[in-house]
Amino acid sequence: MSEADASDAAPTGREIWIEKYRPATLENIYGQEDTVDRLQSYIDRDDLPHLLFAGPAGVGKCVTGSTPILTNKGIRQIGEIVGDVDGFAPAPQNLKVCSLTADGSFQYRHPSHVFGKRASGLQRIKTNDGATLTVTPEHKLLIRTGENTNPTWVPAADITAGMHVLRAKNLPIPAETTGSCAASKNASEVSHIGDEYRYHDSLMADVNTRIATLERLIEDYAESRSDGSLKFTLIGAHTPTVSTVSYLLATVGIASRHTSTLIDSEKRVHAIIIDASDTVRLEEMIETDWDTVMADQTTTVTSSSTASTTKTTQSYLSSGETQTCGWIPYADGGVTHPSTQHSPLHADVVTVSESLDAEKRVYDLTVPGVRNYVGGCIPTVMHNTTAATAIAHAVYGDDWQNNLLELNASDERGIDVVRDRIKNFARSSFGGYDHRIIFLDEADSLTDDAQSALRRTMEQFADNTRFILSCNYSSKIIDPIQSRCAVFRFSPLSETAIRGQTKDIAAAENIELTEDGLDALVYAAGGDMRRAINSLQAAATTGEVVDEETVYTITSTARPEDIETMVTAAIDGDFTTARSQLQTLLVDTGMAGGDIIDQLHRTAWNLDLDEETTVRLLERVGEADYRITVGANEQVQLEALLASLADTQ
């Protein structure tokens, strides 16, 4: 089965939608406008207290697969790394990707997760230097919008022609390969390179091998131009790829430009161009005795004269990082250049930003801490996918992950969790913010002793830590903790809120959802957004239209009219019909007795009954609910309920 066929056969994938569509920002929360406004006011004032969330359960970016990325194993297509994963999955343990760190250097980091999905409505970005990126509209690139503005992450959909996208110019090689290369140990071994794999191997080699490979590439594929620039012409299956040459040049601090020309309607000629000043530097590197330089272990960066070039170059060739320098782009023959030759970033003008009406499988990586990786045929800094709680996003922005600890008390209940994990996180050092956040879900599952220990911890670390506790029942949280928190009580979601998000998800997943199917989902959810989303995903697995019949079948929920028929028959004295309808719900529909009680309670005031009869029905429902809760037989109690209604006539 092809990838497209597989996608059509299983439109819902293997993702868990309640995680996929969990609100990432306060603006994404449906149906709790007043609570969101209060929370936002704390954040706007930079005065976040301890918080206690109480309420019922359930209230409350990417590139295409052919995109090459720089890893500790060389250049690999991201589609090969992620594979056929749908949604998030753990990343391979031995994988590292090249990422831009906060101090402006490039390092190799372990990604925590990989991500894959089908997506339509892509965005294509083209630059003056020949870079072409096809990404989802929300995927972010590092952009500078004007001459004197700082770089910011901008979604692809908001990028326009004239902006400057930042690309990697000085790339390190992985620390484990620095100084040696299993495939090519010295320059003599690259004297005859017959295919792309050898070039790829030399990309991860020591400086001797990389410089020797570049020398061979110049001999075989390059020509000097009248303006002093150098042009590599690549055509045919046995020439190195554009990405290999571009990345190889970037490991020695040289930015390149890519152009392509279609000839004979079927053959494409690619060219890699480096400007005159970088050509001179490359020639100096080729003439340098790198064995002597490496032996001296020179690491001093000096940029005051041309004679210092070898010292400067060696420092970023032999380490896992690069120097950080300011840069100001200026035009020279259509190519933008950094203000100094040692800047790790290169500014490239966006020429085209266009929407594509196409559907493709897209991929991403999550790199903790730095949240970016180097990718593209010409190395470009790209943002990665991430998700977190809305408040952490609002307070810390992109730095939420280093300042948030999430625990679930129902999984890890007891006093040891409070004493160990929470205290260790609260004590660990951090900088740049007044406090960190510890989020404890289902806090009402903690024992009283654990809550007492938590209260002492909240007091001890009040200066640098804020706690957010979530629970279903605030009455199960001890008073000393409640008194230290701003309490937010989340009400069950309205039908309008559930209807709105359910429709949005159906549209995002290309699901045909009928109006009666939507009504059934809202009814079955009963104010629980998680149940609505789970029910929608379950109904969509059939690959058919999600209608009323599908929803009631999937959720084992009785239609409101079936409940009304049963109750009305009992009140009219037709116990036989009422009992038969009850049997249908228990046996054919597969409902539990407790679920029938819940539906009776929810629909009592919507039935066409007078007030006295409704009160009597609710009284009987309460009695049956209590008896079933303490262990009585469900069918016996429900039949007794119907009999009592019939007996009053």
From Swiss-Prot:
InterPro entries registered for this protein in UniProt: ATPase_AAA_core (IPR003959), DNA_pol3_clamp-load_cplx_C (IPR008921), DNA_Rep/Repair_Clamp_Loader (IPR050238), Hint_dom_N (IPR003587), Hint_dom_sf (IPR036844), INTEIN (IPR006142), Intein_C (IPR030934), Intein_N (IPR006141)
Gene Ontology biological process terms, A to Z: DNA repair; DNA-templated DNA replication; intein-mediated protein splicing
PTM statement from Swiss-Prot or TrEMBL: This protein undergoes a protein self splicing that involves a post-translational excision of the intervening region (intein) followed by peptide ligation.
Gene Ontology CC annotation, any one: DNA replication factor C complex
GO MF term (any one): ATP binding
Function: Part of the RFC clamp loader complex which loads the PCNA sliding clamp onto DNA.
Protein name per UniProt: Replication factor C small subunit
Annotated organism of origin: Haloquadratum walsbyi (strain DSM 16790 / HBSQ001)
